[in-house]
């Protein structure tokens, strides 16, 4: 009996221990870089250079009067980032706008651009101006935006002109009128007719009107990016 116990203990004691298992290897996965959309950071200037195009490189007959490059705008001074009278848009939007111009020309009409791509710094300057002149209502009422589709190169402010005189058609209010009179539907007579002409021509090529501003149209592309590249 004693021998059996000893043997039993020996069996237990001498039994080989199970091999030590290494802890499972944890694979580390690099975090994906943040997608740069209109809600995140500004894209590098090199990216802007590859995606933005001068509208007149698609159709040189489009007239450009970039108001924010001059003192002829609601702030009374040129805005930061506007160093030249060149209207830029995303290439897709610039191409579509050239088609609008081509559609209008047989009717003796053309486009005149007041603003296209807008550097982020210019938008921030507009917001700062509203604070200096105590006009927060312009932000809350939707006339000035702290984040604008102009920063994406996907918005354009424009009107119709007669050709070859380049005379602007009657639209009821000047560009950048901050009142209900500028709402696209708030016009009658000749102004209403001309606003509808512009709207129909722009919508035919994929642009969408902002109903509080008869002059403001937007275009859509997948994964839009914000830019701050100066206009030069």
State each model region's role:
Residues 2-7:
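Sec-dependent signal peptide recognition
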Residues 125:
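Thiolate-centered catalytic microenvironments shared by cysteine-dependent enzyme domains
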Residues 15-116, 128-212, 221-232:
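Extracytoplasmic cell-surface/polysaccharide-interacting catalytic and binding patches
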Residues 119:
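Segments that shape or occlude catalytic/ligand-binding pockets
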Residues 9-15:
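Hydrophobic h-region of N-terminal signal peptides that target proteins for export
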């Amino acid at each position: 009996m004693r021998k059996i116990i000893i043997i039993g203990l020996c069996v237990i004691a001498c039994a080989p221990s199970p091999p030590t298992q290494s802890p499972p290897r944890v694979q580390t996965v690099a975090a994906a870089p943040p997608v740069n959309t209109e809600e995140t950071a500004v894209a590098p200037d090199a990216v802007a250079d590859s995606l933005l195009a001068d509208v007149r490189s698609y159709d040189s007959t489009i007239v450009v009067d970039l108001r924010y490059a001059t003192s002829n705008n609601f702030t009374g001074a040129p805005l930061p980032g506007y160093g030249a009278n060149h209207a830029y848009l995303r290439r897709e939007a610039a191409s579509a706008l050239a088609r609008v111009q081509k559609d209008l020309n047989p009717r003796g009409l053309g486009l005149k651009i007041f603003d296209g791509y807008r550097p982020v710094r210019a938008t921030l300057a507009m917001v700062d101006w509203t604070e200096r002149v105590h006009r927060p209502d312009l932000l809350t009422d939707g006339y000035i935006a702290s984040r604008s589709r102009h920063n994406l190169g996907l918005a354009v402010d424009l009107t119709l002109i007669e050709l070859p005189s380049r005379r602007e058609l009657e639209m009821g209010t000047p560009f950048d009128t901050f009142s209900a009179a500028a709402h696209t539907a708030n016009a009658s007579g000749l102004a209403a007719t001309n606003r509808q002409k512009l709207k129909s021509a722009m919508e035919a090529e994929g642009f969408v009107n902002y109903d509080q501003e008869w002059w403001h149209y937007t275009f859509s592309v997948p994964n839009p990016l914000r830019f701050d590249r100066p206009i030069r």
